[in-house]
Amino acid sequence: RNQYGKAQYLPVDENHPLEPTDINGVNAIAGEKYHLMYDKVYGIKAVSLRMTNTFGPRHQMKHSRQGVLNWFIRLLMDKKTIGLMGGGKQIRDINYIDDVVSALEIAGASKEADGEVYNLGGNPLSLADFVEKVTKALGFGKWESTQFPDDRKAIEVGDYIADISKIKKQLSWEPKISVDEGINKTIEYYIKNQKHYL
């Protein structure tokens, strides 16, 4: 999602202007362009999946820089209070890792996907609602609203909801794991294995 920057319309389709607000978005666009150019010019098969917030087992949870959802789960499991910037009202499209892996497998094996770009998503939810679902699954947990620091406010993209109709139509992919089921599977995994990820 970081390739798009602030959404000019929702849901965001693959034709949405690419206006990243941070260097990660710029890097994602550059990587995508290189791969698709190699596909077109040199015949090296490539497809680009524009992923959104992904969570699940085996994802790092030490910090919030990559994978804020797993970091939230870690903080709640450690009985720490989460500070949600802006009250966590911003909507993110969320995918459980198994659904992302499924999309990668399908796209990688499909001739129709060659040279294409697809959005992943399908589970839009506010960050506060995600945290509430985790606290419900754990049976405990707290969060509080915090202000955006200036450096974070400058790169905050606001709401993001992906239009996944292209990948649904062309590759018959859509998420199968609900956010609630994914949270339960993630918590179950980290109850046994969290020490390896800290």
Residues covered by each model-derived region:
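Short, structured secondary-structure boundary patches
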Residues: 18, 68-71, 166, 197-198
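Conserved active-site helix of classical SDR/Rossmann-fold NAD(P)-dependent CH-OH oxidoreductases
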Residues: 29-36, 69-73, 101-102, 128
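C-terminal substrate-binding subdomain of Rossmann-fold SDR/epimerase-dehydratase oxidoreductases
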Residues: 76-198
